[in-house]
């Protein structure tokens, strides 16, 4: 889980030379969304401003997960624009959780790097019953849910509880599933019983009551024993096989019937039951969190699996209706049926819940890809460094190894980034020739295993292509720019080509073809996206690289 904090009043920026103009920027520092109902979508706009005299191309957008899901996104219809002045960008806010949301949108521009804008929005549930859970997480949320699950609760007693279970809640004739006769399904094996008239007949026909939380581990007394939110009808043999075995995934089953399995001291319900079992267990652990006599240590080894099942098998309409039906009889509600996302905001159900330390650093550009640029002209490339974890992260010792290729000025020295905080690093490049060149940006963090960070800088064809030719070989490319067909022509007395390849600006291979002709080749590149590419011709003397533009 990643918990985000609001950005400090300003973004920390590593500034380049004072006379240097930025390539592009956002018109706003923050996009603020109105209070939004969870599950609905709000839209707001900002503008991206091109500060150069060239047309720039947006190559991508980055958004970040909040509790395993992105709340902010781009409309699917927006695309990746080319822009020469001001370009309006729409951002959508579709929250799942009733919390304050604080995140980033990072926009990536070909050959000019990345910029970030802060995104802020709050969400609420339509049901005021859960208002007390707003913006809560961990132990605070768990205690709030413990209180909520006790509201209006009425213990039915075990006999009445089973009567309600068999004749009402899971009886498909009366629970909304429209069976013609009394009909019930065993949750583990899928076996069906029809035409029974009462609990006694059903029990005589091999069915009984499964306690998801075993009676022997704390569910043998009232009100736990008869709490319908963790009780299910089962075929009695399957119930005995499960016993008080912990839930989990089974790879080598000793027993398997109807999709459920047992093996390796774990019991795995069939897929139809996994999500319901998970939400029953999380409910029980929350509802009776303050009760005595319950073995919560038994739960600890199952929590991650139960959370995964809760997420992978969301509530169906039948489960939602089942929850309402139970509420009609015993008065309370299961919050994990109505809002399964609550589970992502609680790190531990078996112990006191604290955020799990999760230091993470995001670097927008793993390398600086300047492409082919003119000698003597100054260019800027911007990089976003973002603390997307939940711990403070220090970033320090910024250096560029070869400052004849690129420079930056770091005014404020080393930086401690709070969770949710970012910096923008601006790099200034002024090539003195058109020859390929490369160097590295280096810096350090205090994250274990990520202490030494390296961002390579490539310009004028050095982008991972490794030109090996030590002398010039004439290669004609036409038309360039091209809209689909590209012709290559060379002097066969100088070189004998073997392969031609096209790389995008990130260095990824986009096109490859074997060359059979002695003098020329025609390439159909109409399937490639518009943009700049590096054409590499592999021949008997090494490699020759040229820039190609596809319109």
Which stretches of residues belong to each language-model region?
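C-terminal outer-membrane/trafficking sorting elements
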Residues: 419, 468-478, 482-551
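Short, solvent-exposed loop/turn segments enriched in Ser/Thr/Gly
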Residues: 38-46, 87, 96-105, 375-383, ...
